[in-house]
Amino acid sequence: MLEVELDIFSGMPNPKWLLSDREEKELLDRVIAEPTQISPAYTPDEQFSLGYRGLIVREIKTDESSWSKARLASASPLPNEFRVGSKPGTQATATWLLQTSEMKYKQSRVTDELREVAAGGVALVQSSGGAVDLANSTILDAADNVEYSYFPTVTGEGAHTPGGGGIVAEGATWFPCGANYFDANANFFNDPAHIAKNNCYCFASNHRADSRYARPGRRGGQPATSITCAGVIAGLYADGWKDGCQPNGLTIVLVIWPNVDYHFYRLVTGGPSWWWGHKPGGTPAKYTDDCGHSLYQVNGSGYAPNNCCRGNYTNFCGYFYQNNSTAFVA
């Protein structure tokens, strides 16, 4: 029995549905005809943008279905979990798989809005900083490193700076706290045994909880119910996040795909470069945005969560703080 997951959300549970035996047989024929169209479900080697990241197919039960029989056959190379749609030339199968969610009885929760987003295909980010281990690198001060000291012209809104003022959002201001806790630990969250089990809120809270759909407020007994700035902020408050500096404090940013999903960024280094990191759902944590820009500043110019490429996460909800020793999620 095969389950399909539309990998599209960062925080909320992704839509899932089951394939019929006839659909399993067609998928089997497609994969056997062109096995290179599938890729590992989760790997640190692919840097995904926010939004649509393909479809994950997994065998949830061994039965008499076409796929189970083929996989149990001797010398069968078929995996029990894989991703479709993340490679060039695989969109036909991905499009067909998405169409299998349209039967009402499957109750897949795939809306017209999600179908429209998925129709745009997967955006793999060519990341200049994706492989950088900031925890052990010498580029924390980008101003002293030529490779990380150049920015293309930033049009529109400039990057926020600590205490810079002029920030309009429902949440808090980015304060220049004197007791920050910084941890550029994307590699820790990208451990193959944990990468798929932690979402953006786990990374923001610096808590590798292995809770794939950790939700603001659940730990505090008041899980966010509306996917709006106000709704998710209420959940943050229940989990102990504050509007002002905290001892040994984490600094995070909340952004919203209106009424659909939430996403977080975490400040991972101090000034003058102010690097930010984030983790799109169950895919790798990284220090770049959807356009491949590294999330840091040089002499006050560059990219931060407020002005980086965020796809459909258009609502900027502000800055929040918590003591790192108490920032647990559920």
Language model feature labels by segment:
Residues 38-47, 211-223, 241-247, 253:
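Surface-exposed patches in mature extracellular/periplasmic domains of secreted proteins
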Residues 150-239:
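Cysteine-nucleophile protease catalytic domains, especially the papain-like/related folds used
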Residues 1-157:
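Function-determining sites in protein domains
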Residues 27-28, 204, 265:
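Residue-level detector of buried hydrophobic side-chain packing
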Residues 102-147, 271-330:
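Active-site or metal-binding loop neighborhoods of secreted/extracellular toxin and effector enzymes
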Residues 51-53, 200, 249, 261, ...:
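Residues that flank catalytic or metal-binding motifs in active/ligand-binding sites
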Residues 224-283:
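...with weaker cross-activation on analogous glycine-rich loops/strands in unrelated enzymes
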